[in-house]
Amino acid sequence: MSRYHTFTAADAVEYARQFGQVADPQALVTADEIGDGNLNLVFKIRDTAGISRVIVKQALPYVRCVGESWPLTLDRARIEAETLLTHSQFCPQHTVKVLHHDAELAVMVQEDLSDHHIWRHELIQGNYYPQAAEQLGEYLAQTLFHTSDFYQSAQAKKAAVSRYTNPELCQITEDLFFTDPYIDHERNNFDPVLLPEVLSLRQDKALKLAVASLKHRFLSQAEALLHGDIHSGSIFVADGRLKTIDAEFGFYGPIGFDIGTALGNLLLNYCGLPGLAGPRDAAAGREQRLKDVQTVWQTFAARFLALSQEKAQDPALATEGYAAQFLQHVWRDAIGYCGSELIRRTIGLAHVADLDSIDDEEMRRACQRHALSLGRALILVAPHVDDVGGVVARIRQSPSSLTPQRC
């Protein structure tokens, strides 16, 4: 008989007392539920002084806003905890610390990050963290290299691919990224004024062929243990620090997906800035986002290449020049997935505040159109792209379009 039951606030406090690793467990007295609560229950556990000490997170067996007609596997809580633990093994400085997890209860206890801020909110407010892009690139390199064939033995990786198989959460990604935006689907959500742009995407045969290729790689290429949902809302920042959270979409997939999703969220902010700030601040912020895109990729690529030279275990993959060749393939994937993120966050089910929080209706629509055109252009140009500098230069020169020529 399963021990699973949905936690109350009192349950969360008691659980934190047992597994929160605090010096005085009885000082933990209250729990505040945070988040929207549609997929998970998340509690901040506070002590007698009102200070948040740890986080208790429990997976729900269905999407609460829909009900039991949309069930979800509780095993995603195990996958999330183990993904975070694995990533923490190789990059502890940029991964939230898991203090305890219980697969049967679908619950885990995490360190409290109240002294950090959600990166998306900070980007929207115009608050700049100069270390964040480099630290994100470091996180991506460390976690993706050490869970790839470059470092893991073939036997260990095959076992890990099986252990991290995550079909229900992957199905959500497959639908929301690669299917829904290009068909008439009830999950899609967009301003009716954007219908001409939406219809243009649906009728673009070259675009749909490119998206089909991206989806096929997502389905079939088990290159490394991905975070699976690495956007600016799942990243916390503070002065000199960065931590990733929310890895329930973790699975073995194409390395470029994590990188492209991260870059896509920087470019969503780039597209939204004209509606979020005055002209001078928006221009400066947009230039900084492009520099951030360069920094994330360049840090990732340099570190991944260095790690492959130092630590590659397989003699064939350690062949001089192969890692650099492989990174070209990752880069092209990343640009395609980046474009997919721009499109799906604009007209699909799950939007971002970088665009939706723009008050001026006409400006919001203009920024959304820019995100759609840039997303389409990136997907189409991806097979012809050689380096990040070329892409960034073309975005600067032609803010709303790219042409599929070699960069």
Curated annotation (Swiss-Prot):
| Catalytic reaction(s) noted | 5-(methylsulfanyl)-D-ribose + ATP = 5-(methylsulfanyl)-alpha-D-ribose 1-phosphate + ADP + H(+)
State whether keyword Lipoprotein applies. no
**Where does the chain bind substrate?**
D229, R344
Gene Ontology MF terms in the entry: ATP binding; S-methyl-5-thioribose kinase activity
Describe its assembly. Homodimer.
Q: Pathway involvement?
A: Amino-acid biosynthesis; L-methionine biosynthesis via salvage pathway; S-methyl-5-thio-alpha-D-ribose 1-phosphate from S-methyl-5'-thioadenosine (hydrolase route): step 2/2
List UniProt keywords, sorted A-Z.
Amino-acid biosynthesis, ATP-binding, Kinase, Methionine biosynthesis, Nucleotide-binding, Transferase
HAMAP family, alphabetized: Salvage_MtnK (MF_01683)
Highest taxon above the source species: Bacteria
Keyword Protein transport part of the UniProt annotation: no
- Species annotation: Yersinia pseudotuberculosis serotype O:1b (strain IP 31758)
Q: Which PANTHER family match?
A: METHYLTHIORIBOSE KINASE
Q: Name one GO biological process term.
A: L-methionine salvage from methylthioadenosine
Which InterPro entries does the entry link to?
Answer: Aminoglycoside_PTrfase (IPR002575), Kinase-like_dom_sf (IPR011009), Methylthioribose_kinase (IPR009212)
Tell me what this protein is called. Answer: Methylthioribose kinase
Which annotated residues bind ATP?
Answer: N40, K57, E111, D112, L113, D246, A247, E248
Instruction: Write the gene name.
Output: mtnK
Q: What does this protein do?
A: Catalyzes the phosphorylation of methylthioribose into methylthioribose-1-phosphate.
What Enzyme Commission number(s) does the record list for this chain? Answer: 2.7.1.100
Q: Which family does it belong to?
A: Belongs to the methylthioribose kinase family.
